Structure formats: C-alpha cells, structure tokens
Amino acid sequence: MPDTESQTQDKWAQYPCTILEFAPPERLRIDLRRPLGAPERAILASLGLDRPFAVLTAENPMGENTEDEPTPVQQAESDQRNDARRGELEAELRKSGIEYQPCDGVAADGEYREHGVAVVLPREQAVMLARRFGQLAIFWFDGRSFSLVGAVARNPSEKLPKR
C-alpha cells in the first residue's frame, strides 16, 4: 500500500482534471482543463460568483475513497458518512450567515463525484475551513481564473488549466 504522502500526491495530480458542476437554477459545467470563457463567466456572475470564491467539500477527508470497488455495504457506509459531513459543512455556513452555491467536483470521465459548495470567503478562511474538514485542497477562483490551493496538503498553488 502506498504511503500517505504518495497517496496525497496521487490525489493532487487528479484535481486539475476536475469538472465543476454548479446546480440549478443556472446549470453550469466548468472543465478545469480548459480556460474559462465568456459564457461561463456570465453564468458565474448570475450566481453572484463574479468575485473571488472557493469550491470545497466535506466529503472523503484525506482522500479516503480508497476502495476502488467497494462492496454495497461499504458504499452505503461511505455515502452515509459523506451525507453527514456535507450536512455539517452546510449547517456551519448557514449558522455563520455565509451563502453558498451547491457545486460538485466530478471526474472528467464522470465516474466519481464529490458534493461540495462554492462560497465567497477570503482565501485563507476557505483553506482553514477545508482543513477543519480534512480536505487536501480547494479550488480557488480569483475573479479571473481557477487555481488548486493546498489545505491539508502543503503543495504550492497551481494555476488552472495546467499548461
């Protein structure tokens, strides 16, 4: 079994291939492998996300989705833990009066999804929140483009799309 640092780096290498899916009312898919275009920017603006924001999740802390082919029982247990974590994150945001937009991170092949949120917070506050939920990284939008920013993982930030 690979060591924790190796697992972290394997996960980190996958993040730049993520598709961000924003929930209705404005269905939006942002492929982080491609530059952001005017249509995507317009929809982000309609969602109130035309300024810096973070995309983060509470699911699968430390990249814990290590089961390549979980049994139905393992999958049900994982789903239950993730539902509880997501509820805790959303409750914390609501209690703090912080608005959020549902936003899922999806593997490019569509085989993997983590439910998350897009939230307008200062970058360091978003990183601290992600760390509290055991997350390796967040996606950060600086008002122009996205970056991958380490939370628990201490990797240097990477502009997306990768060149």
Feature map (PLM): residue ranges:
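Mid-chain, well-packed structural core segment of small domains
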Residues: 94-122
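N-terminal, charge-rich interaction modules
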Residues: 1-91
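Flexible, charged surface loops at secondary-structure boundaries
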Residues: 47-50, 111, 132
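Low-complexity, flexible helical/coil segments
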Residues: 97, 136-139, 151-157
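A generic "folded-domain core" signal
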Residues: 82, 141-146, 151-154
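Short, low-order "capping/linker" segments at domain edges
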Residues: 120, 150-163
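Structural alpha-beta junctions
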Residues: 84-100, 134-136
